[in-house]
């Protein structure tokens, strides 16, 4: 637990708050304890702190107290849906016109997908139809981990940015991504 001129922070022994990562915005919510309730405004993973999740708080909390966290579930669920939709759309764009996704924004009211090249209208319409087909097919979403050595066996859209154990997400037989 610490504070500086920019804000108040806490690293917990366990957390369900998702840190901003992989194009998905961080969770928000509250921490409750003997001090009352404080807002969790943001969460991020701190590599210098061995991958701990840092919770950015609206007010300081005492060190060493037990807390209970509650995430803003409607926000989290919306981001989960958008993130999965982004996987479907990126794969559909790749299949429809060879369009490669380079960046996404999921946090605003309007989500955006940036492509390496400009997409033609026919390619976008085909991608939309493919993505809708995947939604209606109700493919299962499965997450699993593989070692770096095992990665070569999986046909990924792009190489992962992480090393060591890599988390893969498979959406039926439609998409597989790190």
Protein language model features and the residues they cover:
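Active-/binding-site microenvironments in catalytic and ligand-binding cores
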Residues: 1-178
């Amino acid at each position: 637990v610490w504070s500086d001129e920019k804000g108040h922070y806490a690293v917990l022994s366990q957390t369900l708050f998702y840190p901003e990562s992989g194009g998905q915005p961080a969770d928000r919510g509250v921490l409750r304890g003997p001090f009352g309730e404080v807002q969790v405004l943001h969460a991020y993973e701190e590599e210098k702190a061995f991958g701990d999740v840092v919770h950015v708080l609206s007010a300081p909390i005492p060190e060493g107290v037990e807390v209970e966290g509650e995430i803003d579930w409607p926000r989290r669920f919306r981001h989960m849906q958008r993130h999965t939709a982004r996987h479907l759309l990126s794969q559909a764009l790749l299949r429809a016109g060879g369009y490669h996704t380079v960046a996404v924004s999921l946090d605003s009211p309007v989500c955006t997908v940036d492509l390496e090249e400009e997409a033609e209208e026919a390619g976008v319409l085909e991608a939309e139809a493919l993505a809708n087909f995947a939604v209606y097919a109700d493919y299962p979403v499965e997450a699993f981990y593989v070692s770096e050595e095992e990665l070569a066996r999986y046909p990924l859209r792009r190489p992962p940015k992480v090393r060591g154990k890599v988390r893969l997400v498979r959406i039926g037989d439609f998409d597989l991504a790190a």
